[in-house]
Amino acid sequence: MRGRDEETGEFHDKSRSQNRRDALDVLALGEKLVSLTPAQLARLPIPEDLLPHIAECKRITAHIAHKRQLAFLAKHMRREEEATLDAIRDALDANSETGRREVAMMHRVEDWRERLLAEGDKALAALLDDYPQADRQQLRTLVRNAQAEKAKNKPPRAYREIFQVLRALMLPAALGLKASAEDADPVESDEADED
């Protein structure tokens, strides 16, 4: 039973409507968790006792049975601390934000690739202004090869390679990291020494 504070007249506990809204929020969170891949689930701070329930919910595909299993998962999730559920929500939000940034970065890479193929050296100069660490000669050669492949109706090998080079160039900047060729070389040489 809910009680009232005699002095202020306010209720001590949540209303029944608020409890329902909270339960629906937890159910929606459970649906999101069930829709994730195992690799994505591994990155989230999910308590070990919830993992079997998530796996069971993924396994069941019949509509009503799946819905019932989701409700069962939500019941177990409501037993967890609110801080645990908030941590899961925050991690999901961070993952979705990272995904949106990666998609936006891929679109920028595709735009630059199309611009390089359409405008040539003019676009290359603009790219080098934004990314001075880019290899001018490599990009110029790839653009020339991609244009030749397109003219001869050959497979777009250089076209794809331009994408890979631009992605490697823009990814560290998009994620806020500083990377250079010198940073990558020691890792490769260490791995070569171990073999």
From Swiss-Prot:
This is Dual-action ribosomal maturation protein DarP. Its main location: cytoplasm. One of its GO terms (cellular component) is cytosol. PANTHER family: UPF0307 PROTEIN YJGA. It comes from the Bacteria. CDD domains: YjgA-like. Keywords: Cytoplasm, Ribosome biogenesis, RNA-binding, rRNA-binding. The gene is darP. Belongs to the DarP family. InterPro entries: DarP, DarP_sf. GO terms for biological process: assembly of large subunit precursor of preribosome. Member of a network of 50S ribosomal subunit biogenesis factors which assembles along the 30S-50S interface, preventing incorrect 23S rRNA structures from forming. Promotes peptidyl transferase center (PTC) maturation. One of its GO terms (molecular function) is ribosome binding. It is found in: Cytoplasm.
